[in-house]
Every structure is written in C-alpha cells, then in structure tokens.
Amino acid sequence: MKEIIESIIEGIPHGMIFDTHTIIEYLLQKDSDAYLQNCDGRTTTSYHGYIGQVINDIAEEGLVRRVGDSWSLNIHKRFSECACWQKP
C-alpha cells in the first residue's frame, strides 16, 4: 500500500495541499482493486486510519508534510475531519 500511495503523491503537483480523503478517493477511483485487497477485514474507519498512518510514515521520509486538518467529504459523502498534507 505504501508504494501505491507514494505513486499517487508523486503525481500531485509540488506545493499543493491535499487531505487523506483525497488519497482514499483516488484509490477508489483509480486503483479500487488495491484498495480492496489491502482492507484485510478492517472496518472502514480502521482502514482509513491505516491509510492516514501510511501517509504519516511517508511524511516522516520527507515526501509530504502535515499542514493541519480539513473538513471534507468522506466516502459516505458526509463531512468529517481529515488530516491535510502538502507536497513540498
């Protein structure tokens, strides 16, 4: 999953801010097989938390940096709090 998320982030223009919901939505639209294969029986909340942790791990390597939180649509089309990231 880390490699897939890194490739998504690599396609985001430098300086852009995005949130974890954006990465999840991209996975669902462009690589739904990878999204489903890596779910491992987790609940949606748990799995999306895992995806956020993967992005945080990528941030520790310097590919992105955390820039606060957003209030954005989740996969259920409901607004919820979500971590924001910026690609330097």
PLM feature segments, named:
Residues 1-11, 21, 29-88:
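Phospho-regulated, low-complexity intrinsically disordered regions of nuclear gene-regulatory
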Residues 24:
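The alpha-helix within a helix-turn-helix
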